[in-house]
Structure formats: structure tokens, C-alpha cells
Amino acid sequence: MIAILGLAAAAPSAQGQGYNPFQIGASGGIAFPTGDLGTGTNTGYNIAVVVGYKPQLLPISVRAEAAYNQFGRTGGGSSVNIPSFTGNVVYELPLGMSFTPYAIGGAGLYRPSVGFNSGGATSAENDFGWNIGGGIKIPLSTSFETFVEARYNSVSVSGPNGGTASFIPVTVGILF
């Protein structure tokens, strides 16, 4: 009896063998300025590093991201730079298909600034921001997946100009 209990406790489930709930990845894509930010800036780009935790058999996971967005100013001479550090919750919609749609949303620290090509002074302040969006995840193996997503980001900008900086990055990424 003790031997049977020992074997039962030592034998991992076939479904759980080799599963690692921790993920790391990267993404990049195009970023569209909207609202106040869309006035006077051009379409830009987004790059990000992702660290996540995805419990097995649950449709909810968490993702921490360090991202960088840059938008050129119309007329040249400067750019708007928005690095961010956010925590996000991902909810997968398990539909039993070869891809999985998901909703994502979170909040964190954004640091918008304007950089001048002539080397002029820049100003940057830490501001609160949030994001919400969705995507499609495509598993390529048990430990490797790719995704395509779009998220609306809104940053409450402090300082003399104030207002809200909003943008929508459309990205492609990989997770290991």
C-alpha cells in the first residue's frame, strides 16, 4: 500500500509533464498616435520585452512588460518617446481552435518625453497609464507561441502641457 501511494505521488500527470508556467518573450510593431498625441506626430513604432506567468489549465495569466514607443513629429526635428513598465492580466477565450483569442489589460508607469534632433533639452515625467486590447495567440509547440495584438494605451500626462497621450500599438511577438 505504501509503495502504491509513493508511486502515485511521484508520477506526474501526463498533461503536466514538461510544462513551465513562466514565459519570456519580445514583441514589436507599428504604433498609431491618437487623440492629442495624434496631432503633430506621425505613426511610430513599438518594441517590448515580456515576462509572464501562465498557470496550467487556467484561462488567466499575468504579464509584465517593458516597452518603448517612438513617434516622429510632423515637420521633423524631434520625436515623442514613451517608455513604459506595465503589469497586465490576460484572459484567454478557449474555443478549441488552433489559435486562441484573448483580452488583455493593465496599468503602470509611462514616461513620455520629447527628444530634439538638435540635442536640445528634453523633459520627462513619470505618469500613470493604462491599456486594454486583444489579440490572437498561436502555439507553435508546447513551449513556444507567437501572438498578434492591438492595445489602446492612455497616459495621463502631467507637467505644463498636461492632457492625455493615447496610442495604439499593433504588434507581433513570441513567447517561450
PLM features: residue spans?
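Surface-exposed strand-loop-strand hairpins of Gram-negative outer-membrane beta-barrel proteins
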Residues: 30-48, 125-126
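Transmembrane beta-strand segments of Gram-negative outer membrane beta-barrel proteins
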Residues: 18-32, 103
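Cleavable N-terminal export/targeting peptides
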Residues: 1-20
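Solvent-exposed loop segments that connect transmembrane elements
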Residues: 20, 117-122
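Gram-negative (and chloroplast) outer-membrane scaffold detector with strong preference
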Residues: 47-118, 127-130, 138-140, 144-146, ...
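Solvent-exposed loop/turn segments connecting transmembrane beta-strands
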Residues: 35-42, 74-79, 157-165
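Secretion/assembly modules of Gram-negative surface proteins
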Residues: 14-21, 52, 90, 135
